[in-house]
Amino acid sequence: MNKVLKNSWALFLGMGFLMMAYGYQGSLLGVRAVQEQFSLTATGFMMSGYFVGYFIGAMTIPNLISRVGHIRVFAAFASLASLVILVHSVFVNPYVWFILRVLTGVSMVCIYTVAESWLNDRSSNKNRGSVLSIYMVILYGTMGIGMFLLNFSSPENYEPFILVSIITSLALIPILLTKKKPPTFKKIKGMPLKELYQTSPFGMVSALFYGTIQSALFTLLAVYAAQMNFSIFQISLVTFLLAISGAISQFPIGKLSDMFDRRKVIVIATFGASLFALFAIISSGQMYLPGELATSKTWFFIFLILFSCCSLPMFSLICAHTNDYIPKEKFVAAGAGIQFTFGLGAMSGPFLCSIFMNIVGSNGFFVFLLFFHALIGIFGIYRMRVRQSVDNPDSQFVAMPSTITPAGIELNPTTEPIEEPKKPEEIPPATNL
C-alpha cells in the first residue's frame, strides 16, 4: 500500500482536487438554477450537457492523447475546465450553460482517461486492486467534501465560481511537477453492442437504465432539495450523504453478490432503492399528510442514505454480472461496452427526470428514480426465468466508479494480467579459460 501511494501520490492528489471541484460545481449549478428560476426542463437539459460532452470526449480523446501525450492533454483540459466554470458566472443562461456543461464533460473524460491510464501504467498485477480501491475512496471522498463547500458563499455570488476554478487549477500543480515519465497510451476497443447484448442482455439493459438513474441523481438532487426549501447546509449535507453512503455500501453488497446469484442481489437492491425512494417521498412533507403524520427531515436523510446504499453499487454489480458470462480475456472489452451503454443512458437522464418533475412536482425526482429502478428489477426477474445463472471462477465483484474509462477498467484485478516490464537478464561474469 505504501508503495502504491509513493508512486502515485501526485496523481491521487491532483484527482482529489478535481473531484472536490466537480462535487462543488454540480451542487452549485443546481442551486443557482433554482435561484435564477430556470424552468425544470431547461435545468434538466442544461445538466444533461455534461454527459453529452462526456460521451463525445470518450470517442475522440484517445486519438488526441496518442498524438500529443498525457501531460499536455491533462494540462490543456484541466485549464479548460477551470476556465469554463468562470464563464458560467458571466453568462447566466440555461442554453449557454448547456454548451459550457458539454465542454466540462469533454474535459473531465479526458482527465479521467489520462489519470486512469497513468495509474494502470504504474500498477502491477499484485497491487492493481489496491490502486483501484484507493482511487475509489479518493473520488467519492473528495467529491463529498466538495459538496460541503457550498456553504462557503451564496451561489448568487461570483465567489463560488472563482473557488471552483482555483481548486481545479490546483489539480495541475502536482501532476505537472511529477518526475515520473508518462505512460504509453493504449487504445481499448469496446465490445460491439450486438455481441454485448447477446452475451448479457440483463447487463446491457441494466447499464442503459442505470445511466439514466445516476446522471439524474447526481445532477438534480441539489435542484430537488432547493425546491423543497432546504437550507444551503442541508443541501450540502444531502449531496454529501449520497456520495459517502454509496461508497461505503459497495463492499458489503459486492460480497453478497459473490456469494449468491448476482442477478438476485441486483433485483433486491433495485426494489430496495425503489422502496426507499417511496419512503423519501413520504418523508419529504409533500404528501399532504395530516399534521400528526407529518415527518421531519431527519427521516428523509435516513431514507436517502438507505436509497444510496442500494443504488450506488449498481454499476459495479452490472459489470460483475456481465463478466459472469464471458471469458477473462474479454473482461476489459465488455467493461468498455458497458461504460458506452451507461453513457447513452446518462445523456437522457437529467432531461427525462425534469419532465417527471414538471408533471408530478418536485417529488417527480424520486418518482423517476423509483420507476427506473423498478424497471431494472422487473427485467432482472424476467431474465432469471429464461436463463440459468453461471459459476465463472474468473469473475468476482470489484467496486468501480461509474466514471471509469476503459483504461481504468484494466485496474480490475480479475482481468487478464497486465504486461509488466521485464527485468534485464543478468549476464554471468566472464571466467578465465
Features from the language model and the residues they span:
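Cytoplasmic helix-loop-helix junction between adjacent transmembrane helices
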Residues: 102-137
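Structural signature of the two symmetry-related core transmembrane helices
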Residues: 72-86, 165, 264-279, 370
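C-terminal membrane-cytosol helix-exit motif in multi-pass small-molecule transporters
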Residues: 150-151, 165-185, 376-385
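Intrinsic disorder in cytosolic terminal tails and internal cytosolic loops
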Residues: 1-3, 185-190, 383-433
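Helix-loop boundary and gating motifs at the non-cytosolic
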Residues: 2-51, 203, 214-224, 228, ...
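Intracellular juxtamembrane helix-capping segments at the cytosolic ends
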Residues: 110-123, 312-326
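Helix-to-loop junctions at the C-terminal end of transmembrane segments
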Residues: 57-70, 154, 249-261, 357-358
